[in-house]
Amino acid sequence: MAAVKENRLRVLIPQEELEKRVAELAAQIDRDYQGRDLICIGVLKGSVFFMVDLLKRLTVPIAVDFFQASSYGSGGAVRGEVRIRKDTDLPIHGRDVLLIEDIVDTGHTLRTILELLRFRGPRSVRLCALLDKASAREVEVPIDYRGFEIENLFVVGYGLDYDERYRNLPYIGSIEPTKA
């Protein structure tokens, strides 16, 4: 078995700040979707921790679904094409859709997902993103509910990973991979 390389990690957003902001986002979403037919679609895998905490705090009735797309290779390297790995199961035509994402960086993956969802005729599509890496944006993506704006750093924790590691950290940290 190959040795696991250690990486330098520092806390960017502590657990307490995450919990507070998620509660604020849930309250805002509750206000905006009172009396509406809301379907929440999480973008796998990174959004799961955020999505679960957010949905537990909502009081409006919801349906839950998932979508998975990728544009990343091993070690976080960005590839140019967006690949759909898992599509939604529930019909969204005529419904309000809230897409829940962990991080928006270049915007390419989310733009593709949003275009696909809008093509299916929902009543509305809004985006809730825990993290916004605006300085890395290459294409415009409207974020309706934003948790935190962060610098252009590689981040892990609270669902975000580096080679499938660090997802279970209860905070958002920045990581600096060590050289082999």
Placement of each model-derived feature along the sequence:
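PRPP-associated nucleotide enzymes
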Residues: 1-180
